[in-house]
Regions:
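Short phosphate-coordinating micro-motif centered on Lys-Gly-acidic
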Residues: 2-6, 10, 14, 19, ...
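Pre-Walker A adenine-sensing motif
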Residues: 30-39
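Hydrophobic anchor at the beta1->P-loop junction of P-loop NTPases
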Residues: 46-48
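Walker A (P-loop) phosphate-binding loop of P-loop NTPases
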Residues: 53
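Conserved lysine of the Walker
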Residues: 56
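Conserved nucleotide-sensing/catalytic segment adjacent to the nucleotide-binding pocket
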Residues: 73, 77, 83-123
C-alpha cells in the first residue's frame, strides 16, 4: 500500500525522554494502554506506529478504556474513525487504508485534532503535517516470541514527557 508522505519520528541518540517498555502478552499491552489512558485528557494526541499486527489496536483499546470510554473498543480499520464517549471523548482513528493526502482532509482529521477530545491515531505516519508538534509518538515493535512487544514512547513536548515518566515508573517492574 502506498504511503502518504509525512514525518516518521525516529528515536535520536541521547534522547533521555524516550522510554521502552516490553510487554509479554496482548493482555499486558492492553494493561499498559489502560495505565496510559488514565493519565491522558481531552486535547491529548497519541500517535501509534508499528508493523501490521504489532498491537496498535490492542494498545489503543487499553488507552480508550483507561480514559473512561464506554462500550466495546473495536478497530476502526473499515470505518476510519470511531468515537467513544465517557469521562473523556476518545477518537480512535485508523489511517491504514489511506493512500492519498486528500483523504486526510476528507476524513476531517484536522477537525478531530481541535483539542476537544483525546485522539489516538493508528498508522500515524500517514497523518503528515496535520500532526501537531506536541504529541506522544509510540512505536510498537515485535520482540522475541509471538506475543512479546517493545513499546517505545517518544514524547514530543513537556506534557507528554511527564506522562511517559509516570507510566515508566508505574510499569518499572515490567522492564
Amino acid at each position: 500500500m502506498p504511503q502518504v508522505p509525512g514525518p516518521r519520528p525516529e528515536p535520536r541518540a541521547g534522547n533521555i525522554s524516550q522510554v521502552r517498555i516490553d510487554t509479554s502478552s496482548p493482555e499486558q499491552t492492553e494493561a499498559l494502554g489502560r495505565r496510559l489512558g488514565k493519565l491522558l485528557r481531552a486535547g491529548d494526541i497519541v500517535a501509534l506506529s508499528g508493523d501490521l499486527g504489532a498491537g496498535k489496536t490492542v494498545l489503543a483499546r487499553g488507552i480508550a478504556e483507561g480514559a473512561g470510554a464506554a462500550g466495546y473498543i473495536a478497530s476502526p480499520t473499515f470505518t476510519f474513525i470511531r468515537a467513544y464517549r465517557g469521562a473523556v471523548t476518545v477518537y480512535h482513528v485508523d489511517l491504514y487504508r489511506l493512500d492519498r493526502p486528500q483523504q486526510l482532509e476528507d476524513l476531517g482529521l484536522d477537525e478531530l485534532l481541535d483539542g476537544t477530545a483525546l485522539v489516538v491515531l493508528e498508522w500515524a505516519e500517514k497523518a503528515g503535517p496535520l500532526l501537531p508538534p506536541e504529541h506522544l509518538w509510540i512505536t510498537i515493535r515485535f520482540r522475541n516470541g509471538d506475543d512479546t512487544r517493545a513499546v517505545e514512547f517518544l514524547p514530543r513536548g513537556p506534557r507528554y514527557t511527564d506522562v511517559v515518566q509516570t507510566v515508566a515508573r508505574e510499569c518499572a517492574s515490567w522492564r
